[in-house]
UniProtKB/Swiss-Prot annotation:
Keywords: Cell inner membrane, Cell membrane, Membrane, NAD, Quinone, Translocase, Transmembrane, Transmembrane helix, Transport, Ubiquinone. NDH-1 is composed of 14 different subunits. Subunits NuoA, H, J, K, L, M, N constitute the membrane sector of the complex. One of its GO terms (cellular component) is plasma membrane. This is NADH-quinone oxidoreductase subunit K.
Amino acid sequence: MVPVTWYLWLAAMLFTIGLSGVLLKRNALIVMMSVELMLNAANLTFLAFARQTGDVGGHAIAFFVIAVAAAEAAVGLAVVIAIYRTRGTVNIDEVRALHE
């Protein structure tokens, strides 16, 4: 049996990679993928604690987060496609500069 701390370290690394992608990248698609990675890290944490305690609440929360992430990805991708069609770019800095 794998200790829970290994799952937590993996989740922390995934969350850190996702956070660095959100903070450092300027492409809207990369930022969206980084947010999804952060949500998956949170799911892994919920599932690790649910496995340790034997409670099914962590599994229920993980399914809810997956549903919210799917909706967020669909809406976010639609927004990115609309921005690309109108502006011709998905670079966050250029879109923000055009807004001002």
